[in-house]
Structures are given as C-alpha cells and as structure tokens.
C-alpha cells in the first residue's frame, strides 16, 4: 500500500511541476486579452498566475502615435464622444474620474473626479468634496469657459441623479440629493457665457 501511494505521489508531482530536459518548467504569464477596442484605443485584461486581474489601456492618435498607455487595477470604461475625442472613466476603490483624449492633436485633459456630464467641449463635475461646488468648464482649456455653483449643505455628500441640457443647449439642469436619503433638488448651470460671443 505504501509503495502504491509513493508511486502515485511521484506521478502527481510530475504532472504538477512538468519537466523540460530534467529542469522544472515555469508556467508562462498569460497573454493580455482585449476586452474593448476601437480605431485609436485598446483595453486589455491581464491576469497573473495568482489570478489577480489588472487592465492595460493604450490611446493613440489617428496616425498611430501613442498618447497614453498604462496599467490600472480596475477596468476603465471608454466613451467615444466624436470622431476626434474619447472620454475614459477610471475607477478607484471608492471613486471615479474621467480623462479626455483628443486623438487628432494628441492632447490629454486633466482628471475630472465625479464627472457626470460632457458634450465634447464642456465637462460638468461635482467638486463637493473639496469646495462644495458643481462646476462646468472647458475640457482642455484652463482659461476657457468655467462656471461654478456653490451648494451649501451640512451633508458630507452630494449625489447627482440626472443631468440634461435644455433644448436650446444653453443650460444644464442638474438634479441632485444631499446625502443618500436627502430630497432631490435642481440647479441650473449655464453652458454659454452670456457676456461673450459663445463658449
């Protein structure tokens, strides 16, 4: 009985380790698997031998120049906004942020935490954690259009539930709650600078 157990154990070890010319064979790292792609971007899943998943992403210009390429812990979500602009939402353990990529010129925007609306030119986001404000601004130009609306509250959180532009495209109507169980409120954020000839 002991001999049979020893033989069985030896065979099992051979299957587990594997051999190549008398040396243990290492298990290769798995290849990346594309989970999302387009003309100018690709998101791939990487899984190591321990089963831990990570994601890589690459964004390129129309002519193939790499704008940005990196690895992140959570799967990013890509949203093409038009033929020359991508928005990518990245997720942390407790938050999310969006970065925009101009795939024609190669520009990359700042990271907008808690972004909840965009139209290809402007982005609206909740800056409540830092300054209790809702902000709408130019995606790329720090000196471009910017409007801030202060929201006074004792609540620690502001949750945007809906954001829609008016039919004329000049105002963004934002519905939000202060805290998880707060009553829903509305605020209007202008999308056009009335003091100039446009955005």
Language model feature labels by segment:
Residues 28-69:
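Long, hydrophobic/aromatic N-terminal blocks
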Residues 15-18:
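C-terminal motif of bacterial Sec signal peptides marking the signal peptidase cleavage site
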Residues 72-100:
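Right-handed parallel beta-helix
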Residues 20-22:
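Bacterial signal peptide processing site
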Residues 2-10:
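Sec-dependent signal peptide recognition
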Residues 52-69, 92-111, 132-155, 179-199:
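Surface-exposed loop/turn elements that mediate protein-protein interactions on large endomembrane-trafficking
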Residues 28-35, 71-81, 110-125, 155-165:
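Repeated scaffold domains used in trafficking and secretory/extracellular systems
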Residues 34-51, 82-93, 118-129, 134-135, ...:
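Short beta-strand elements that form the blades of beta-propeller/WD-repeat-like
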């Amino acid at each position: 009985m002991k001999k049979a157990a020893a033989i069985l154990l030896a065979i099992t070890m051979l299957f587990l380790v594997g051999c190549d010319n008398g040396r243990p064979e290492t298990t290769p790292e798995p290849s990346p698997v594309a989970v999302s792609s387009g003309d100018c971007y690709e998101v791939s899943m990487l899984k190591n031998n321990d089963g831990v998943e990570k994601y890589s992403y690459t964004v390129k210009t129309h002519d193939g120049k790499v704008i940005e390429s990196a690895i992140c812990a959570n799967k990013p979500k890509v949203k093409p906004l038009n033929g020359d602009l991508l928005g990518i939402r990245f997720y942390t353990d407790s938050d999310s942020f969006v970065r925009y990529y101009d795939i024609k010129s190669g520009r990359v925007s700042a990271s907008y935490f808690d972004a909840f609306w965009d139209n290809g030119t402007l982005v609206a986001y909740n800056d409540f954690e830092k300054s209790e404000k809702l902000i709408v601004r130019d995606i790329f130009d720090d000196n471009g259009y910017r409007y801030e609306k202060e929201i006074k509250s004792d609540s620690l959180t502001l949750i945007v539930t809906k954001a829609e532009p008016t039919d004329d495209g000049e105002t963004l109507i934002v519905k939000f709650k202060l805290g998880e169980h707060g009553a829903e409120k509305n605020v209007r954020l202008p999308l056009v600078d009335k003091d100039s000839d446009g955005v």
